[in-house]
Amino acid sequence: MNIVPQDTFKSQVSTDQDKSVLSSAVPSLPDTLRQQEGGAVPLSTQLNDRHPLESTLKNWETTQRQRQMEQYRQIFGIAEPMKRTMEMEIVNRTDFNPLSTNGSIHRDILLNKECSIDWEDVYPGTGLQASTMVGDDVHSKIEKQLGI
């Protein structure tokens, strides 16, 4: 059971790793525009422009959610985390509004965040992933939701 996310800070960069976003024209080449790294970025900036805490902050909520589900499982049995996971999946599948700039109130209630105000609630799209980058428009959201 982790309280703090695993450290995924890169100390070295290789050109053959992280092929998660490949070009549709040439599968062996990475698609630099869809990686949302700002286009053609030198490898040195991938290493030097990242702070060691950035990866921890990106994975913070996921790790806390996993820890919470593990504690629910230990206290209430397997039914409680299964129920909460299914409720979250239902909300993620049904609450789809690509024109909405803020999050879903249903998701906030399930995550127990309905009374908290985060930076992203006041200034949407200014978090770790800005909404002004390539591939984050209405059409891309609809394509991603429908699996196109």
Curated annotation (Swiss-Prot):
CC per GO annotation = cytoplasm; nucleus
Q: Please indicate which superkingdom the organism of origin belongs to.
A: Eukaryota
Q: Where is this region: Disordered?
A: 1-35
Enumerate the Gene Ontology biological process terms.
DNA damage response; proteasome assembly; ubiquitin-dependent protein catabolic process
User: A Pfam family in this protein?
Assistant: UMP1
Transferase as UniProt keyword:
no
Modifications made to the protein after synthesis? Seems to be degraded by the proteasome upon its formation.
Q: Which UniProt keyword terms apply here? A: Chaperone
Where is the sequence biased in composition, kind Polar residues?
Answer: 8-26
- Reproduce the miscellaneous comment text: Present with 2740 molecules/cell in log phase SD medium.
Q: What does this protein do?
A: Short-lived chaperone present in the precursor form of the 20S proteasome and absent in the mature complex. Required for the correct assembly and enzymatic activation of the proteasome. Also prevents premature processing of the PRE2 propeptide.
- Family per record: Belongs to the POMP/UMP1 family.
* Name of the featured protein: Proteasome maturation factor UMP1
Q: Which organism is it from?
A: Saccharomyces cerevisiae (strain ATCC 204508 / S288c)
